[in-house]
């Protein structure tokens, strides 16, 4: 199964995330299929950049977004 989830980057106490499409069995920061966005929770307000065209493509192909990514998609779509 393919999932849309967050990949953690940045330094200690300063997280920065990539929104990636990856196999569900792959490690959090392991191999991924495609980068479809970024999320920076440390800015005010938190910065979310998603390529909605690719998000919709992968969801149509059967990819399951994680709970956090679902919330980010809702925030961008609103």
UniProtKB/Swiss-Prot annotation:
Which InterPro entries does the record match to this protein? Answer: Ribosomal_bS16 (IPR000307), Ribosomal_bS16_dom_sf (IPR023803)
GO terms in the biological process aspect are:
translation
Question: At the top level of its lineage, which domain of life is listed?
Answer: Bacteria
In Gene Ontology terms, what is one molecular function of this protein?
Answer: structural constituent of ribosome
Which GO terms of the cellular component aspect does the record hold?
cytoplasm; small ribosomal subunit
Q: What are the record keywords, sorted?
A: Ribonucleoprotein, Ribosomal protein
UniProt cross-references to PANTHER family, sorted A to Z: 30S RIBOSOMAL PROTEIN S16, SMALL RIBOSOMAL SUBUNIT PROTEIN BS16M
Q: Which family does it belong to?
A: Belongs to the bacterial ribosomal protein bS16 family.
What name does the UniProt record give this protein? Small ribosomal subunit protein bS16
- Organism, per UniProt? Thermodesulfovibrio yellowstonii (strain ATCC 51303 / DSM 11347 / YP87)
Taxonomically, what lineage is the organism?
A: Bacteria, Pseudomonadati, Nitrospirota, Thermodesulfovibrionia, Thermodesulfovibrionales
């Amino acid at each position: 199964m393919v999932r849309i989830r967050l990949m953690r980057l940045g330094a200690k106490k300063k997280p920065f995330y990539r929104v990636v499409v990856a196999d569900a069995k792959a490690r959090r920061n392991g191999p991924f299929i495609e980068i479809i966005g970024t999320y920076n929770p440390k800015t005010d307000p938190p910065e979310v950049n998603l390529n909605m065209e690719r998000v919709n493509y992968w969801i149509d192909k059967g990819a399951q977004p994680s709970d956090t990514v679902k919330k980010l998609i809702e925030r961008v779509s609103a």
